[in-house]
């Protein structure tokens, strides 16, 4: 009987804590830089880019890679599935630092342009897919 009561009390406590968590609001973390690279050169590009990234942009960026053993890697930086920068990285790291610095500058410029476009082209009477 004691064991039965213990199980009932434990079950009630579990249900009570479950109800407490149901009322909580999920917190979204802004400004994530997501790594979707596969090869070592892609990972190094992501590390170099993220180490130097100092933007106040609150959206999420994704760095994607399409590797090729023969030719190198095609790196794409996207925001909400919109491509804002693409480059080709060679496996021998030719001009690697220049490419990272150029990617940072172009990404920052593209994000600024995107923000200006969204501000100027705000069409509150149309849905996003209608414009």
Curated annotation (Swiss-Prot):
InterPro entries: Curli_CsgE. The keyword Signal applies. Keywords: Signal. Transmembrane segments: none annotated. Pfam families: CsgE. It comes from the Bacteria. Residues 1-22 form the signal peptide. The keyword Iron-sulfur does not apply. May be involved in the biogenesis of curli organelles. This is Curli production assembly/transport component CsgE. It comes from Salmonella typhimurium (strain LT2 / SGSC1412 / ATCC 700720).
